[in-house]
Amino acid sequence: MPPIKRSKPDGGVKKISITATDVTPAKGVEEKMSWKEYKKMKQHTGGGTRNKLKKKQRPPTENTEGRAKKPKVLTKEQLERHDTGADQIDPSSMRSKLQQEKMKVTKDKFQRRIEATAKAEKRLVENTGFVAPDEEDHSLTYSIRQKDIAESVDLAAATKHFELKLPRFGPYHIDYTDNGRHLVIGGRKGHLAALDWQTKHLHFEQSVMEKVSDVKFLHTENFIAVAQKNYTYVYDNLGTELHCLKTMYDTARLEFLPHHFLLVGSSRNSFLNYVDVSVGKQVASFATKSGTLDVMCQNPANAIIHTGHTNGTVSLWSPNSKEPLVKILTHLSAVKGIAVDDQGNYMATTGLDRKCRIWDVRMFRQLHAYSLPFGVSNVAISQKMNVACAVGNHVQVFRGMHNGTCKEPYLVHNCGGVVTDLRFVPWEDVLGIGHAGGFTSMLVPGAGDPNVDTLRSNPYETKSQRKEREIKQLLDKIQPELISLNPDDINKVNEGLLELEEEERKKILYIRPMAVQYTPRHKMRSKKSGWKMEARKNIVKDQIRMERNMEKHAVEKEVFEAPEVDDEAPKKKHILDRLK
């Protein structure tokens, strides 16, 4: 087919004329033409559709410097941030060559994982925001009110600022879930409510008709621990009472250790109680002998409990010791607030001496101290190291307290009532405030981590994902015996405990066994005589002695060397050997 001709007449309308040529032979088609013959004929007559022109190839890109680009090298700090001990693996310490090769493969796999994680971290392009005044305006940031911030941000962020005015039942204590999605509030006069604070969906609301000292979420939003007048109660997400923990009496503060499933309560009679909520068993309970324990927090890095006392000291507790692991003199007056960051590196304390002090938990040394105009009661630390302090009816938020660059407050908000509780929302730029007039959700730009770690806690998890996470948490549960100041101790072998168990086992060799005391049950209508009763006693005693002798024989084999055995197999005895 020849090309299409286009012509433009004087009227301005395009006209298209198409001409066709007949390629049939003049004599006609005598035989049936094959596909290959038809293809050759089409190419010969010029009507082929195949484009004989070669494809244009893209010219090779040449580097201006004349050499290939080198891959970006990761810095040592980026690799150390994600290193979990791969450099400490020594394949040469293995005995056999097969084990050495396996350990080399394992070490290479760990190193590749570290590099992949460090490279993926570069793709986290979300940055934290902050509040800054205009260049022409020389006003300070703490003069900006919450109303101005809510009008400047997007609609989704503006809805996160709200207030619940409940002056009849306050003051309130609050708590958020680990993923920051759900909120529970408890008033001193018995008001209790739980809700999804982002969608404002109310789970339940009721009055327990008793004084509420503190509230705490357990491993999911379906379980809520409430410290009431006498005992601690556990409710579900519908407000139904599930348990009454009478071992936690007169509790003032509550903390939950998610990796150990331990609910910790500090009572007004100086007792510290640990309860395993997965099995409902009390793990430890001891008197601290330090007065009322109304100031308490946990170190998320190692699950150590920090308590503040009226003599200005802060004590660090573990369920494995009835004495404090560390005792620090933090203030010259009573301690009113304690907070530890998520990494477990810094601790903030406040006291009646109008001081807010920042401590290095790793060295137990004070880094900085800041003077405030009034006595500070509560304190909280966000994921990005913003420190919030409750000063009477006001809440002051500071930036850079841990590195000494803080000179004035970052934000200030008047709550209209005495502040009793502060909680930063994980993964959000929001600070929850419980006060005498109700609850306030305060916007704090730059407080939360913008890159959500869904493996750690997912704010958008579904019901099936929540159930799966709950099962994984139970499978990965850490025993309370492993709680210590150094969280890396969980990767080591407890040689002292192993030696102690071995010594206890060896005592069976030289300690006199205790007399077996067994009294068979008396049957009223039994026809057995007295000697049969004694026979039953002897059978049970002989069985106990036999088990003990077998255990003693096994220990003797381990402790003492086994007798030498000849290499030659013993010959079978023949009946005529007696005649030799």
From Swiss-Prot:
UniProt-listed GO biological process terms: maturation of SSU-rRNA from tricistronic rRNA transcript (SSU-rRNA, 5.8S rRNA, LSU-rRNA)
Region described as Disordered: 34-108
Keyword Metal-binding attached: no
Residue windows of the WD repeats: 193-234, 235-272, 274-312, 315-354, 357-396, 399-436
Keywords: Nucleus, Repeat, rRNA processing, WD repeat
A single cellular component GO annotation: nucleolus
Disruption phenotype: RNAi-mediated knockdown results in induction of glutathione S-transferase gst-4.
Compartment(s) of residence: Nucleus, Nucleolus
Keyword Oxidoreductase: no
Bias type Basic and acidic residues, positions: 64-85, 98-108
Pfam families recorded: BING4CT (PF08149), WD40 (PF00400)
Complex formation: Part of the small subunit (SSU) processome.
Name the record gives this protein: WD repeat-containing protein 46
Originating organism: Caenorhabditis elegans
Gene behind the chain: wdr-46
